[in-house]
């Protein structure tokens, strides 16, 4: 029922119906597209998964295996705070407290406070994120405070930038933020929707440079090379 933060968009309503009906709901978006369908309710059970995959591995037509899992399964602290535990630092498993403590101001919180201040002073300022609202400090309480001036498009960075471009055309001042690695997904929209059309928007890059995330899929070292050659785009890296 969630990916990172709460879900947004029309698809999730039908996915919920399928979960609640154990996959038997008459309204099934996958079958509507011509696929066969199998629902696995106990997706955290390895044996159940093996049984499901054994049933479909030799099938002669496309099938969607819809697997229901519990985020944080097996660790009560994570089960009770799913958004915060989507990603974490090394921690003490008994208490859930991080092994590294930090009590100063973070860039995330500083950025959120600045954007919130601008939003309160100007109702045309709109913050847009793609499923990672806390990358610029928009915790659940901040999201509620921002109201309609905060938009989470889900894991759809392409839509986030295209939406920002449309908002500009209608008099808004969009601020789009996501992690450095995720900007590669929306290169075309940045180039064609924003920059070719000279639509002014602010893009905030999180976890960039060698000081960002260091796993192979989330490296933040490519954004400047990728985007700085796009006409009408100015990349500022003050830190």
Regions inferred by a protein language model and the residue ranges of each:
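A substrate-engagement module of RecA-like helicase motors
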Residues: 8-12, 16-24
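Mobile "lid/hinge" segments at catalytic clefts and subdomain interfaces of large enzymes
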Residues: 1-13, 29, 197, 231
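Thiamine diphosphate
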Residues: 21-25, 35-52, 58-239
């Amino acid at each position: 029922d969630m990916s990172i933060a709460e879900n947004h968009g029309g698809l999730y309503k039908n996915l919920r119906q399928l979960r609640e009906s154990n996959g038997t709901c008459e309204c099934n978006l996958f079958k509507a597209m011509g696929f066969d369908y199998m629902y696995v309710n106990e997706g955290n059970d390895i044996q159940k998964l093996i049984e499901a995959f054994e049933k479909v591995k030799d099938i002669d037509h496309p099938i969607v295996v819809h697997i229901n899992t519990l985020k944080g399964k097996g660790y009560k602290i994570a089960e009770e705070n799913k958004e915060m535990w989507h990603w974490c630092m090394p921690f003490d498993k008994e208490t859930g407290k991080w092994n590294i403590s930090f009590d100063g101001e973070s860039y995330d919180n500083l950025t959120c406070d600045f954007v919130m201040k601008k939003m309160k002073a100007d109702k045309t300022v709109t913050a847009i994120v793609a499923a990672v609202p806390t990358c610029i400090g928009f915790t659940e309480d901040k999201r509620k405070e921002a109201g309609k001036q905060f938009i989470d498009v889900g894991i759809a960075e392409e839509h986030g930038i295209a939406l920002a471009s449309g908002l500009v055309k209608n008099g808004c001042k969009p601020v789009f933020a996501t992690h450095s690695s995720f900007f590669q997904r929306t290169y075309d929209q940045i180039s064609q929707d924003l920059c070719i059309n000279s639509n002014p928007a602010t893009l905030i890059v999180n976890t960039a440079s060698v000081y960002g995330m260091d796993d192979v899929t989330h490296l933040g070292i490519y954004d400047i090379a990728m985007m700085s050659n796009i006409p009408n785009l100015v990349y500022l890296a003050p830190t």
